[in-house]
C-alpha cells in the first residue's frame, strides 16, 4: 500500500497528539492506603510508621498517615476515618484507640472501604466484620506474661517478698488490659507482690510524675511499666541516686528502653517487632487491593530481651533507625 507525504504528516500529527494526551493523563491508578495510629508519642508507633513507610515505597503505593494524639481521643480518630474516605483511600489500616470503639458503627465512618487492623485488637460485630480484611498484631497478654515470667523466675515462691509498682499506661486503652492480665497470671505462684498500680496516658510528663510518686514510696524493688514510664524512670532514678535500688522492667520495647538494655539500666523487655508489623500491614492491604494472596492474620513471634540477648536482626525488625522521623505521606513513584 502506498502512503503519500500528506498522509504521513497526518498520521505523525495524530500520533504526537495521542502521545501528549496520554502523558497528560494519570498512569494506571496507584493504590491509596490511609493509616491511622492512636498516637505517635513514643518510638513504638514511630517504628510501626517506619515499617509502613518503607513497605509502601517497596510496594509502590500512596500512603497517608494520621494519628489521633492519644488513646482518649476517640472522636478525633472517628473524624480521621472520615478523612481517609474523603481522601479516596482504597484501604484503611487502623490502629484503634479502643478495641470496642467501632464494634457497631465502623461502616458509618468508612462506608465500604476495606479495613486492616494493626497492632491493637479491633472487635467488630457480624455486620461490621465484613469490612475487616486483615489483622496484624500479637496478643499483648503474652507481652505482659513474658515480663511477669521474667520476674517470677527471679523471685520464686519462698524466696522472699518482692515489691513492685505497675505503671502500664492508660487503664483501659491500647494493650493495657491484656498486658495486666498476662502479668498477673505469670506471677501468681511467685513472691512478687504488687504494692500499687498507677494509670495515665503514655505521655512523658504524666508518666514522669507517676515515677516520682513511686520513688517517694520508698519500698519498691521494681517498676514494671510501659516504655514511656521506663524511659522516664531511667532518668528519675539517676537523679534520685536510686538506680541500683529499683529494677526496671518494660512490657514492650522502644529506642529508650533499648538504650537502657544496652547500658544495663533496664533488665528486661519483650518485643513484638513493630517495624515488621508495619510492613505486614501495608503488605496485606497492597496484596488485597491487587487480588494477590496474603496472610489474613499475621503475628510476629514475641522475643524476650535482656542486656545479654540483643540480637541485631531482632532489633532491626523492631526499631526504626535512630535518625528516622515521623513520615505522614508517601507518594508512589511512577
Q: PLM features: residue spans?
A:
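Hinge/cleft segment of the Venus flytrap/periplasmic-binding protein
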Residues: 167, 171, 276-334
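Structural motif
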Residues: 63-88, 196-217, 230-233
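Flexible loop/hinge segments that line or gate small-molecule binding clefts
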Residues: 99, 104-142, 254-267
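Hydrophobic alpha-helical
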Residues: 94-111, 183, 200-260
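Extracytoplasmic "Venus flytrap"
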Residues: 32-51, 55, 59, 64-80, ...
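Hydrophobic alpha-helical segments within soluble ligand-binding/sensing domains
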Residues: 134-162, 207, 253-257, 273-290
